[in-house]
Amino acid sequence: EQRTEEWYMARHQRITASNAYKCMGSESMQNHIIYEKCKPVEIPDAAKEKDAPYVNTNTPCHHGQRYEPISVQYYEFMYKTTVGEFGCIPHNKYSFIGASPDGINIDSQSPLFGRMLEIKNIKNRDITGIPKLEYWVQMQMQMEVWDLEEVDFYETCFKEYKTEEDFYNDGDFKRTK
C-alpha cells in the first residue's frame, strides 16, 4: 500500500521508477539522488499510523495525492474496469530497482486487464497527453519491474474554488439536485 511506513522503507532502499530519471540527468540531479539515498529515511509520523493516509501539504505532490483517488474512480467509471493499488516491489533480477504504480487494472473481464495506470494530477500546466521525460522514464521502469506491457498515462486537472459563487461564475454550469 502506498504512503505507509513499509512503502517509504522499500522506496528508500531502491532506485524507484519515479526517481530513476535523476540517474540519467545532469550532475546536479545525479548528486540529488545520491544525497537522497545516503541520508536516513524520513517516514512521516502519519505514515506510521495504520488508518491515517499521509498527505504532506507542504510539497508539490499534495495536489496529486489529494486527487488521485478521484482520478482512479473516474478512470474506472469511464473505462468500466477496476483498478487495484499495489505497493513498491523490487525488480525480480535487480533488487536495487523498484516500482509502485498508481494502479493496475485487475478486472479480468476488462480489455484493460493487466494494464498499469500512472496518474498525474496537474495544477500549473496544460494537459497534452504527452508525458514529460521523467514520467516516460518512470512508466518504462514500472513496466519492466512489474513485467507488464502497457501503461495508461492519465492526466487530470481538478480546479478548486473558494466559494460556490466562484464556481458558477467560471462558466455556464447547471446545478444538479
What are the language-model segments listed below?
Residues 1-70, 160-162, 175-176:
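Charged, glycine-rich intrinsically disordered N-terminal tails and low-complexity linkers that flank
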Residues 61, 77-101, 105-177:
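Nucleic-acid nuclease catalytic cores
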